[in-house]
From Swiss-Prot:
Family, similarity comment: Belongs to the ATP12 family.
Record SUPFAM superfamilies: ATP12-like (SSF160909)
Membrane topology: Peripheral membrane protein
Transit peptide: 1-40
Annotated source species: Bos taurus (Bovine)
Transport keyword on record: no
Entry protein name: ATP synthase mitochondrial F1 complex assembly factor 2
Name of the encoding gene: ATPAF2
Length: 289
């Protein structure tokens, strides 16, 4: 895979001065779309219309080229990303498409579109508070009272993650069997808001995306801090579902598809956060892990 990435990078460096006509990142040659009222939803499949994918460096960052035309966002903006690593990852998404372009599999492209167009028109503070609000309904904080086997499973699997987060950030989170959930101290919210404020807007888009997939800020922090793997975080977010499946069985194809999709979205969002973060140390640790 990295050979392909290096090839894309080398080709991209030879295409620094291409014409500025472009293709939309959601539909290629499609029309400019109006601003939606929520985050982008990838469109349906369409036939692949390009042969080669490359990256190039422009004034605003790194660009994606499909043949000799520059990729653009659904709102018609030049598709420009802040790092070469992210550009290579996005280019790989486009290059890996076969006869049919399946935009719903191109999570990095969708996250870039959201970051560039900001269809929900939210600022940094709003993104942060949307993520922190998930503490009120965080998956790992809600506990059942029965059956005892599930109570014990939640305690054994979720308590260590909560304990890690409390120690890592110096806060209190806790858990509850109440329908209203745990009472999160105001200081905990303040500390986590301050922590998330250290990320840039692009990374915050990725963080909120992962939080909405896992329904958990605690698990998302474990991922971004490299405390959990994607597989671990997804399993922990689905603990009760997996328990019920083990007990009652499941429709195999449906379960497998849902699980793989959740892993793919979570992995893409986590990678997006790291590739958009300003800390090169974090990126190096991610690549070496």
């Amino acid at each position: 895979m990295w050979r392909r990435c290096l090839r894309l990078r080398d080709v991209g460096r030879r295409l620094l001065n291409l014409p500025r006509s472009g293709l939309t990142a959601s539909e290629g040659l499609g029309p400019k779309l109006p601003t939606p009222i929520r985050a982008y939803v990838p469109p349906a499949e369409r036939k692949r219309f390009y042969q080669n994918v490359s990256i190039s460096q422009g004034e605003g960052g790194f660009e994606i080229n499909l043949d000799h035309r520059k990729l653009r966002t659904p709102q018609g903006k030049l598709f420009t990303v802040p790092s070469e690593a992210l550009a290579i990852a996005v280019a790989t998404e486009w290059d890996s498409q076969q006869d049919t372009i399946k935009m719903y599999t191109m999570h990095l492209t969708t996250l870039c579109n959201t970051s560039l167009d900001n269809p929900t028109q939210r600022d940094k503070d709003q993104l942060i508070r949307a993520a922190v609000k998930f503490l009120d309904t965080d998956t790992v904080c809600y506990r059942v009272e029965e059956p005892e086997t599930l109570v014990e499973l939640q305690r054994n699997e979720w308590d260590p993650v909560i304990s890690w987060a409390e120690k890592r950030y110096g806060v209190e989170i806790g858990s509850s069997t109440s329908i209203t959930g745990p009472s999160i101290p105001a200081r905990t919210r303040e500390v986590l808001v301050s922590h998330l404020a250290s990320y840039n807007m692009w990374a915050l888009q990725g963080i909120e995306f992962v939080v909405t997939q896992l329904k958990s800020l605690v698990l998302t922090l474990g991922l971004t801090d490299l405390r959990l793997t994607v597989e671990q975080a997804v399993l922990l977010s689905r603990l009760e579902e997996e328990y019920q499946i083990q007990k009652w069985g499941n429709i195999e194809w449906a379960h497998d598809y849902e699980l793989q999709e959740l892993r793919a979205r979570t992995a893409a969002g986590t990678l997006f956060v790291h590739l958009c973060s300003e800390s090169t140390a974090v990126k190096h640790k991610l690549l070496q892990g």
